[in-house]
């Protein structure tokens, strides 16, 4: 899988100055970072993690990618006595963590938001208030193919936990297909994968009044799709 991942990194590095799709308009500025929706490894091996570090890097300075990575744990990262959890905890302090980019609050909810992660989420949300713009990401799918990897009760509890908050978007991985759907009033995006046929990644722009998402096909080196909506920040 090294070749397609190197292709992804090469094209991500070349993004600044690229025109967005016409329906979005403007040019891509230097990305602040890359959200990685899990499965940094295939079989949870230390050698897999080292390969991830070598190709992508973690900080924007230690690998080939020029931007820092913010990763969620995937199910391929927790097989057996996996060292990957420890690496993520060492980097971020926990498997669920948050940070701010200007006024936007970004939240990683581990592989999926189980009861323990939701308890942490409630405390995190209590600190920022209901009007702060939120971007949320984790690994497992909420709806569609392969969405039965976590209980429906946990999904309903997450919907309740987010009720009344200013959620701009939710991103997840797991299903190796790029796309967008609505869930409980929230826009949910899937970024695609170097594995299987959906060879895409997402480019996201947040302005004062708009969330825009471009779907970049790294096989054809062209935009596959685009999404935009008005937001309040």
Please annotate each region the language model reported.
Residues 24, 128-146:
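Short acidic, glycine-rich surface-loop motifs adjacent to enzyme active sites
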Residues 1-48, 233:
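N-terminal active-site segment of His-dependent metallophosphoesterases
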């Amino acid at each position: 899988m090294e070749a397609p991942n190197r292709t992804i990194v090469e094209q991500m590095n070349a993004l600044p100055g690229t025109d967005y799709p016409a329906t979005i308009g403007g040019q891509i500025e230097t990305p602040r970072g890359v959200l990685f929706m899990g499965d940094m490894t295939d079989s949870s091996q230390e050698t897999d993690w080292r390969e991830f570090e070598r190709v992508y890097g973690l900080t924007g300075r230690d690998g080939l990618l020029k931007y820092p990575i913010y990763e969620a744990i995937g199910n391929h990262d927790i097989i057996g006595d996996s060292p990957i959890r420890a690496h993520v905890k060492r980097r971020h302090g926990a498997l669920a963590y948050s940070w701010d980019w200007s006024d936007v609050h970004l939240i990683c909810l581990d592989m999926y938001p189980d009861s323990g992660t939701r308890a942490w989420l409630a405390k995190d949300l209590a600190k920022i208030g209901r009007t702060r713009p939120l971007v949320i990401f984790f690994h497992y799918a909420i709806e569609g193919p392969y969405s039965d990897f976590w209980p429906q009760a946990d999904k309903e509890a997450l919907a309740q936990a987010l009720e009344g908050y200013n959620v701009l978007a939710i991103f997840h991985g797991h299903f190796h297909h790029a796309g967008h759907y609505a869930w409980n009033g929230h826009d949910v995006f899937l970024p695609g994968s170097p594995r299987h046929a959906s060879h895409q990644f997402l480019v996201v722009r947040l302005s004062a009044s708009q969330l825009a998402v471009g779907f970049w096909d790294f096989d054809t080196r062209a935009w596959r799709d685009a999404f935009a909506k008005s937001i309040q920040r």
